Amino acid sequence: MKRRLFIAGLVGAVLVGCSPAPVGQGAPGSAVGPAASALAAERATLAPTGALRVGVYRGSPTSLLVDNTGQRTGVSYELGQLLGQRLQVPVQIVEYSRVAEVIDGLKANQVDITVTNASAARAQVVDFSKPLISLELGYLVPARSQVQTVADVDRSGIRVGVTEGSSSQGVLGRQFKAAKVVPVSSLKVAADMLQAGQLDAFATNKAILNELADTVPGARILEGRWGLEHMAIAIPKGREGSLPQLDTFAQQLQKDGTLAAVIRRAGLRGTAAP
């Protein structure tokens, strides 16, 4: 399993999660009273190692994007840092190759949070906050593809790529009657296979499809959708006592416009109306 660890330190490029505590809050453990006790309990549950470990994977604006200058954006990336600021703990960004590995990291208690599709299958192995964002699920097809509409996809001989271990792999594997589901190891591999004519389509949420389309000349996203994803904050099983606090955190981000700003910075496309 490929994994990279980025630690938000107190020197150099300081992450939001490591910014000084707001005036009046003080350093962790310095305040007294019920509010401080509640914060300490929340910190102990969500960041038991003393740092908030945020699981991400590259290529999706819902998780992590890195531009040519090294600037990092993404919903998981930024929300993790904002939660670290709330908890007054440093943030560690733990990078994986694909979303299934992030879920495995949560299951193994190697990371503390991520933002991902709150599918029924994943809810069996991790716990979720209330949904933050809804995304359309669709198909990306290469130039000169014989697939012209969503209805054309489920036909004999059609090869549909999905990220290995993703929700799309499970759902389409059950739904398709004729088309073949082809698991791929990464979005980079998917782009290469689309350009090489080894895939007739690639299926995932439209946020990722838009990013992928930018790297595959002539590729286009089919009109319509085959489903919806509901993105939420995921935490390891056994920490469900912190879900009310996570829901409050998420609702505040939605209410004050912070989540909308994070979505804009990530260039997240393909969102669905609530």
Residue ranges, per PLM feature:
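Extracytoplasmic small-molecule ligand-binding "clamshell" domains
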Residues: 26-117, 265
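Short loop->beta-strand "edge-of-pocket" segments that line small-molecule binding or catalytic clefts
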Residues: 51-56, 151-168, 180
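Extended ligand-binding regions for polar small-molecule ligands
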Residues: 19-21, 27-37, 74-86, 151-159, ...
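Alpha-to-beta junction loops
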Residues: 53, 89-90, 107-116, 158-159, ...
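C-terminal motif of bacterial Sec signal peptides marking the signal peptidase cleavage site
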Residues: 14-17
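Short helix-initiation/N-cap motifs at beta->coil->alpha
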Residues: 93-104, 148, 182-192, 196, ...
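Acidic, polar ligand-binding/catalytic clefts
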Residues: 81, 85, 90-154, 220-225
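Periplasmic-binding protein-like
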Residues: 58, 133-144, 206, 210-251, ...
